[in-house]
C-alpha cells in the first residue's frame, strides 16, 4: 500500500505465424482470472484466485502457439527464476514452470486448463487449475477452481473457487454501457510457501473465507478502456479466522483507465 512497482517489462518476438516467444518480467501464464491484466478485470477487487492463491509475476521465458483452424486452441508454457519481481540476484537449482492450455470450441466458449510449479523457499508447491466461461454480446458467465498442494505435507492443501456473471446494457448518452455484476468466491487457509522465521514451518498468510460481491460498472468508452466500478463486498470467516483490515466488508469505488 502506498508503493509503486513496475509489474511488466518484457520483449516479445513472432518468428513465424501464430508463434511467439517472450522474455522478461511478466505475469506467469496460469489460470483465467490471475492472468488478466488490471484493465481486464471485471471487479474493483480481484478474486482470491487472482490476488492470493494463484497470483504470480516473475522473470522468465515463455512460448505461445495459437491454432485457429479445426479445433482452435492456445498453448502457453514458460520457465521462471522463482525470485519474484525484485530479487533476481540469487542462483537457483530449481526452475519454476507453468503450462496453460485454452480450448476454444467456438467464439462463445473458453475452457482453460493450467498447472504451475513454484518453490518460494524450501517447499515445492504444485498448483492445478480448471476454468470455463461463456460470453456473448451481453453476458459473461465464468467459473474457475484452483487446487494447491505443498510438498512433504508442509501445509494442508488449498482449494479456491471463483464464479461470477456480468451483464452489459448498452447506453446512448454519456456512458457507452452499464454492466451489472455478481460474484461468489472462496478459499481455504492459505500459505505463501515462506517459513516462519522462528518456528521454521509454513504459517497461514490468508485465512479461509467466503465472499459475495455485487456491483455495477459504467464504461465511458469501449469496454476496459475507461471504467468506473462500484462494488459491495460481504465476507464470511470461520470463528478462528483473523481477517486483515483490507479483507473485510466494504464498498469499493474504482476508476480505471488504459492509455
Which residues does each predicted region cover?
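Outer membrane beta-barrel
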Residues: 1-82, 93-95, 102-110, 164-166, ...
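Outer-membrane beta-barrel pore domains
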Residues: 10-12, 22, 34-36, 111-259
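A broad detector of the eukaryotic-type serine/threonine protein kinase catalytic domain
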Residues: 82-84, 148
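Active-site cleft segment of glycoside hydrolase catalytic domains centered on the general acid/base Glu
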Residues: 87-92
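Short, hydrophobic/aromatic alpha-helical segments in well-folded domains
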Residues: 97-100, 128
Amino acid at each position: 500500500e502506498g508503493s509503486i512497482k513496475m509489474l511488466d517489462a518484457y520483449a516479445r518476438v513472432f518468428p513465424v505465424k501464430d508463434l511467439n516467444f517472450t522474455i522478461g518480467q511478466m505475469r506467469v501464464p496460469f489460470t483465467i482470472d490471475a492472468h488478466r491484466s488490471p484493465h481486464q478485470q471485471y471487479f474493483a477487487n480481484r478474486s482470491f484466485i487472482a490476488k492470493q492463491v494463484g497470483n504470480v509475476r516473475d522473470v522468465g521465458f515463455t512460448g505461445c502457439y495459437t491454432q485457429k483452424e479445426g479445433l482452435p486452441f492456445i498453448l502457453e508454457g514458460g520457465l521462471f527464476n522463482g525470485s519474484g519481481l525484485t530479487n533476481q540476484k540469487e542462483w537457483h537449482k530449481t526452475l519454476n514452470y507453468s503450462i496453460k492450455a485454452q480450448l476454444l470450441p467456438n467464439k462463445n466458449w473458453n475452457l482453460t486448463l493450467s498447472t504451475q510449479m513454484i518453490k518460494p523457499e524450501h517447499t515445492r508447491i504444485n498448483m492445478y487449475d480448471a476454468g470455463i466461461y461463456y460470453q456473448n454480446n451481453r453476458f459473461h458467465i465464468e467459473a474457475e477452481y484452483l487446487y494447491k498442494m505443498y510438498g512433504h505435507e508442509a501445509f494442508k492443501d488449498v482449494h479456491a473457487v471463483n464464479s461470477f456473471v456480468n451483464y452489459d446494457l448498452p447506453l446512448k448518452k454519456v456512458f457507452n454501457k452499464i454492466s451489472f455484476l455478481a460474484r461468489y468466491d472462496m478459499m481455504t487457509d492459505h500459505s505463501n510457501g515462506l517459513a516462519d522465521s522462528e518456528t521454521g514451518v509454513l504459517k497461514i498468510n490468508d485465512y479461509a473465507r467466503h465472499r459475495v460481491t455485487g456491483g455495477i460498472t459504467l464504461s465511458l468508452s469501449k469496454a476496459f478502456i475507461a471504467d468506473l466500478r462500484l462494488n459491495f463486498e460481504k465476507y464470511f470467516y470461520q470463528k478462528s479466522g483473523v481477517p486483515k483490515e483490507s479483507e473485510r466488508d466494504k464498498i469499493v469505488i474504482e476508476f480505471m483507465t488504459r492509455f
